[in-house]
Amino acid sequence: MTKTNILSDNCVLKRKKIIDKMRDRIKSPCKKILLVQPVQITEDGIDIKIALNKRYYMYPPYSLGVLTTNLKKRGYDVSILDLNFDLFKIFFENSTESFLNDRITDIWKKRLEEKIKNFEPDLIGLSCTFTMGHDLLIRTADFSKSINPKIPIIAGGVHVTNAPEMVLKEGKNIDFISLYEGDISFCDFADIVNNKKSEETLSQIGTRIDKQYIRIDKRTAPASEELNTIPDYDNLSIGEYNNFGEIGTFRYWRNKDAIGSPVLSNKGCRARCTFCSVANFNGSGVRGRSVKSVVDEIQHLKEDYNVDHITWLDDDLFYNTKRTLSLFEEISNRKLDITWDASNGIIGSAAVMHEELIHAASESGCIGMYFGIESGNDQILRKIKKPSAVKHFLKLGKLMDKYPNIFTRGFLIMGFPNETLGQIYDTIKLSHEMNLDWYTVQLLTPLPSTAIYNEMVEAGTIEGGSLNIDGEGFTMFSVRESERQRRKERQQKTNAKEFHNMFKNNLDRVPTKSELTELWLLVDYLINYQRIIETNDRVKLKKLQRFLTDVSDRMTIGNPISNLFLGIVETKLGRNIEADRRKLLAKEYISESKYWQTRFDSLNLMELL
């Protein structure tokens, strides 16, 4: 790893070096700026059948929309290119699988080349939010330079901020990186190039000079009125995104024909969880937009794009109780007739301490909430600095039972450093006591620039600089854990090993990484599926029916467990013909897979068929 130079050391000299490089690489006047969202999943990671089932996430580039608004206010000619949307739209227009698999790379490259040649930008900005997008960020920069080597390229986003040196080291064609929130600093960067702003205002910028990484760490984060920015999506078809993928995680529970779009009401999070990169990117604390600005944006989406479902991007939606209540009340008062979900997660303790927030949320159209739980063991929760304890989660479960219209889900993580089997089992027990509608169980993926990542590097349990881009990450764009299990199944169909119940052995033992991978299916089964056998509440059963139908028919086609337990749910609801059909499907899928035969035997599920 190269030595990092931060501005505080001989700041004048370092600023001068960066400014000199800016003057050399970016010609003035610089007026036309192309903002690009690269494809989010590598070609070999895209399954066309999954894509056509709208399984991959398809969020509009919200941050680029905000940046476009701010740049246009300063007089710049801005255009947005969303290569991810354009690629997936072509999937649906040309759904011949063999044709598409051979042409994925050609499709996005052709679209990018056309845009660069037609728009003729003076500067290209690339966005990368998630670690798994690292490779495509680099390749997008490389291809852009091959079209016109004279166009300077600047990259920004959460991943770029978390792994800046690696982005610049591997991205030879990336001239500069924009660190942290670029809403203001990127605009200042362009103004400095055009001699419209003092060089001393340069902030949040990094580059490589003489093989050394140099950055200006001083932040120019948007505050007060600067936060009240409604995204300008240029010519993007915001109302169509929902047609080609997921926005949020509650498609099965919202209106069938709902058109979704994301909205951000505040930035940052009060929590300091050791596995989370929010504080590194947004800084400490939470900064909220005005209620009027947020609801104006929702109304704009409704009127201009026919959006009637909102997914909040907030990492701490319930921060500032008074403001949050006002937000929900204003949504209700304007009679916008929308629904919304909180897919990014709600802090459990914030919900139970202010029950009025849940009531107001329900009244304003909330249909789904995720809660960040992570672990059912207080020792682990303290170690990872969660702002909630087991007692809060138990109260939360009882609270949410009062709002059956809201589909409740919980985030759970396995594999924290030195986490024992007993502590993982505590998470299983807590999930049963809380009795949320469903839980997402994931293996820990330490993100660069987080406290837990640094801890694990120092302990030698992971290698420093590893980006872990195999799709297992805790990100909106990653393939879900259930799909990771499908990949594992394909790899092990012929030699699936015996599946052991590790919780019958020494619970004080820390499982190995390979054991954790194998353990995931068992934990997911014990947390989500096993309790269905004892569930008789018709409201819960109706929720499970909707969810498991979506899992079985769209999310993970060929999954015998989801079909079996959907059959059990259908039996309890008195739909015996459908129940028999689902169980027959489960038998069919099991017969085709040694992997599933072994696991059904180990879980004693064959007797349920």
Question: What annotation goes with each model-predicted range?
Answer:
Residues 2-33, 39-51, 94, 208-262:
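N-terminal [4Fe-4S]-dependent radical SAM core
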Residues 63, 70, 79-87, 97-224, ...:
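Glycine-rich beta-alpha loop elements in corrinoid/cobalamin-binding modules
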Residues 51-69:
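Short catalytic helix/loop segments, enriched in acidic residues and glycine
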Residues 120-124, 307, 436:
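Proline-aspartate-enriched helix->loop->beta-strand connector
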Residues 166-170, 357, 418-432:
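Catalytic cores of alpha/beta
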Residues 2, 34, 39-54, 206-219, ...:
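C-terminal accessory regions of radical SAM enzymes
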Residues 59, 225, 233-414, 421, ...:
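Radical SAM [4Fe-4S] cluster-binding motif and immediate context
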